[in-house]
Amino acid sequence: MSIGQEFDDGTVVIQAKRRWTELFMLLIAWAIGFGGWVLTELNINHVLPDTWTTVGGVWLAVAVVAHIFVRIVIPYADPVILPIVFTLNGLGLAMIHRIDYIPDPHYHRMDAQALWTALGIVLFVATLLILRDHRNLQRYPYVLFIVGLVFLMLPLVPGLGMETLGSRVWIHVGSYTSQPAEVSKVVLAIAFAGYLVDNRDVLSRAGHKILGITLPRARDLGPIAVMWVATMLVIVYQNDLGTGMLFYGMFVVMLYITTERVGWAILGAVSFLGGAVLAYTCFGHVRVRFDSWLHPFSNYTQNYQIIQAQFGLAWGGLAGRGWGLGRPGMVPLAWSDFIATSIGEELGVTGLMAVIVLFFILTARGMRTSLGCRDDFGKLMVAGLSFTLALQVFAIIGGVTRLLPLTGLTTPFMSQGGSSLIANWVIVAIIMIVSHRNRKPADDFVATVPAPDPQQAVTGGTR
């Protein structure tokens, strides 16, 4: 316990660090993920392999190591975030392990994903150790903006970018492949926050009123125009609707939060929809993507993936087929783009809804961290990063259920892919650093205030 905030009536809130609560929830997260791995082995092979204790021990050790660093470096951080992320990451590992058995047990995607998980946690810890004050990131918004756009456009460079399944979102260096847009996701959120905080007064100025809605001034449209052009380039030349929607949506939401003007949000939505209609009219591959969404059964061969995903979700029903008892391998890319369908088939609608609830809680804790932040830059940066995770999940679940066109985005922490997993672990580190600063008592207050009267002390919750 430590002294926290003093209110006007003299009441002192004692902020609990809540690290033991975090450790207890991490044990539950470990049991859920490793339990899925165990049930997969029992349902498929009817016996556990000799390595099961090693797998479980390493799985648990990784969680404990991350907890120890959080306890030492950011002891006041939100105690709920890390267990939720470990639960999602563990479920993803267990499902990828299950899919490795299709059609035979010769694939080792889980081994690769486990290594990426370990590397992600290493970078999570490194971020905690290096970024002691998130406000240092505010110094270079324009440099970060340029770096983010460069990474976003790298797949268009001849000889470096590579096209996979119709989308040009990968780069390859030797035998290593990566999605640089995942780096851009973090860098641009930080750059947007720095730029918008510095230019808030200018961007908040009112322009003309149309239908009762105050629109921004024409001279202030430069930033949103740049992002619109970048988004259209991604959609048209990289054939990646998901990434374009993700970045443009993140920028417009952060712009709205900064200015509190509905006109920016409406202008952003209208311009994105207008660009999408223009791309649909002018480019054949964009029309194919939308036609597959609206009329999937008109071409069974072309739309095989989304059709099988619908069948898989229907076969899973409410309770699911059980770990290792479904047929998720009928859906191409069941371990990456369509891992949500695999979860829905084997764990049912109930399991899929539980995963969605976990993402909702994760986003809510991020937004709570944003609201409690003491500086505008941190508030906006955390809101942008949290919204990015929420929008990504919405696009994925909407795609596999045909609420939206397929976007090609991956489920955070669950889908196979090193770039996405590492970037998301860095996002979690940044959010937890800010939450630590929010809940940590001010040094000058701790140094000068006497011990509180026990009758005035109130135990703090899991802020």
PLM regions with names:
Residues 36-52, 68-76, 98-105, 130-135:
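Short, hydrophobic transmembrane alpha-helix segments
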Residues 218-281, 293-295:
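Hydrophobic alpha-helical segments of polytopic membrane proteins
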Residues 3-4, 34, 56-70, 87-95, ...:
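Central hydrophobic cores of alpha-helical transmembrane segments in multi-pass inner-membrane proteins
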Residues 153, 162-177, 256, 264-355, ...:
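Hydrophobic, glycine- and aromatic-enriched re-entrant/interface helices and adjoining loop segments
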Residues 370-408, 414:
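Loop-to-helix entry and N-terminal half of a specific, functionally important transmembrane alpha helix
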Residues 3, 7-13, 397-463:
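A juxtamembrane structural motif centered on a specific transmembrane helix
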Residues 77-85, 108, 112, 126-151, ...:
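Interfacial loop-to-transmembrane-helix boundary motif in multi-pass membrane proteins
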Residues 57-62, 115-123, 345-364:
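Hydrophobic alpha-helical transmembrane segments
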